[in-house]
A protein has these predicted regions:
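Hydrophobic, glycine- and aromatic-enriched re-entrant/interface helices and adjoining loop segments
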Residues: 2-91, 109-117
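Alpha-helical transmembrane segments of multi-pass membrane proteins
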Residues: 11-15, 94, 121-131, 165
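Membrane-interfacial segments
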Residues: 21, 103-110, 143, 174-179
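Residue-level signal for the membrane-embedded core of alpha-helical transmembrane segments
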Residues: 36, 87-97, 117, 121-124, ...
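Hydrophobic alpha-helical segments of membrane proteins
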Residues: 56, 86-93, 125-134
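Structural signal for the C-terminal ends of transmembrane alpha-helices
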Residues: 96-106, 167-174
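Loop-to-helix entry and N-terminal half of a specific, functionally important transmembrane alpha helix
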Residues: 106-144, 150
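A juxtamembrane structural motif centered on a specific transmembrane helix
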Residues: 133-200
Length: 200
């Protein structure tokens, strides 16, 4: 409740203070009002999805160059035009699989910190996908985020691989068997190492 109020309050404040936010919201609500100007990118992306249909026009047969920044923000529109709705759904299923595996890693993690980290990273990944695909399909206003593992952009790619690496580490740690403890040992002794200091 509090988070929602803060989000919508911040969004309303940003809309009033920043002209580029107003421009993006206007493009989102009325893209065909200026199809050759501010709304050109979004209109061409929607046309690309429409031309692609169910199975697309064929790999390499589309015209993604009509969409500005098709290699980054709007790469999903290029996929939709050339390979159709089928390929777009396949991409979404792969992203869903990554999120599902991240949540599964959170569930099997033995420590609370690992659970929180895995859940948070799954939420970050899912939110990024929702924002990107929502913007390209006109579900929400455009933001300029890149599509994970598909869009051109070095820092975004590195950040997403770091997320995957952390999730793999949490999953690996959770799946390792617990050490066998003898009658005279306990977990604290296993985690403690005595270091002898030699005086010189």
């Amino acid at each position: 409740m509090v988070g929602g109020l803060l989000f919508f309050g911040g969004a309303a404040t940003a809309f009033r203070l920043f002209s580029h936010v107003q421009s993006r919201v206007d493009i989102w609500l009325h893209p065909f009002a200026d199809p050759d100007g501010n709304g050109y990118q979004l209109v061409q992306a929607l046309y690309g999805f429409a031309w692609g249909g169910l199975v697309g026009r064929g790999l390499g047969e589309g015209m993604p160059e009509r969409v500005p920044y098709a290699e980054s923000d709007f790469i999903l529109a290029a996929i939709g035009e050339e390979l159709g709705l089928t390929a777009v759904m396949a991409v979404l299923l792969l992203y869903g699989l990554v999120v599902e595996r991240a949540l599964r890693a959170a569930l099997i993690s033995r420590d609370g910190f690992g659970k929180l980290v895995a859940t948070g990273l799954a939420a970050v990944f899912a939110l990024q996908i929702f924002v990107v695909i929502g913007g390209v399909t006109r579900l929400i206003p455009l933001t300029g985020l890149t599509t994970p593992f598909l869009s051109y952009g070095g820092s975004s790619l590195v950040a997403n691989w770091v997320i995957i690496a952390i999730l793999l580490r949490i999953s690996d740690q959770a799946r390792r068997p617990l050490p066998d403890l003898t009658e005279t040992e306990d977990a604290d002794e296993q985690a403690t190492q005595i270091v002898k200091v030699v005086d010189r």
